[in-house]
């Protein structure tokens, strides 16, 4: 197996670069089409119903039919909107979603028509920071969509999304720091190479748990889908959008889901490395086989997104903000200090660093769970001691006094 050097990218012939770009684009589109269909099937199964089963054999062409339907629908532009910003917002959301996948390694070096090339479009010395920066741009499309729509509900959805990204982008970035410390690089291909022996999910479990929570909040998915909460904001930031403009927002959402899943695979699950015991077999991590392992790991995270949507109710906005600022960020900072100390001990010649770090990771995860359980208990205690609600007969906002028939005198 050969790990690509970031300095060697950019030397492929133009047709090979074009082919790899087209391959990444097709991979994302097919993943989105499959994810939408599989999500609807899983939700149907969990809700004891069939799900889509009419278009094509067993409903396999439902996503394609939905795409054609959206393309043929009339594109309405509401009166009073800022037209150019209104039309540009979906484009601003969807383009960064595709750009982030440019530095994700899908496999090792392979031979394509006699040319040796990495299954990766490009790489940078700060590739992970590039992904963090590019994915942050997508929120501008959501905020502009809410502002340009000229309606209160989309505006509130856009503001919620901006606050959500600010809060959880910090926790997500802090979860990367421990990976940088252990890998010694910010290059995605370098991080994958550093996990040749031990995956970082075992060494850096608290960082993985923080990232797992942050990626759900970053993508505005249930139970953190507050910018488009139907019960509060109708449709949120895309209430006034229809036709292909709405389809672009949906495409951006599912591409972002795929991107954060691929990044989790790259940082914590060994990237394209085969899982044990498959990795023992000769050739499991060479040629085109790693693309299969990478895709399977990405789908594992996509199923996690779907499972959360089917099982958990939406959180309140104050609970969501409290989770990010009062739990995830402090835990990340404490964990970074532990990892940096352990790494310094290793550099000083300490030999049992792997076992020690795994033990510390377990202790830190237990402490984080205890803190979360204690906070939940305190909140329940406060709720149980709250004063009883006033009888509706006497009137209490928002219920006016109700007419009550006086009992007849005995």
Swiss-Prot record:
This is NADH-quinone oxidoreductase subunit H. It is a multi-pass membrane protein. The gene is nuoH. GO terms for molecular function: NADH dehydrogenase activity; oxidoreductase activity, acting on NAD(P)H, quinone or similar compound as acceptor; quinone binding. Residues 384-410 are annotated as: Disordered. It comes from the Bacteria. NCBIfam families: PRK06076.1-2, PRK06076.1-4. Belongs to the complex I subunit 1 family. NDH-1 is composed of 14 different subunits. Subunits NuoA, H, J, K, L, M, N constitute the membrane sector of the complex. Its EC number is 7.1.1.-. NDH-1 shuttles electrons from NADH, via FMN and iron-sulfur (Fe-S) centers, to quinones in the respiratory chain. The immediate electron acceptor for the enzyme in this species is believed to be menaquinone. Couples the redox reaction to proton translocation (for every two electrons transferred, four hydrogen ions are translocated across the cytoplasmic membrane), and thus conserves the redox energy in a proton gradient. It comes from Mycolicibacterium gilvum (strain PYR-GCK).
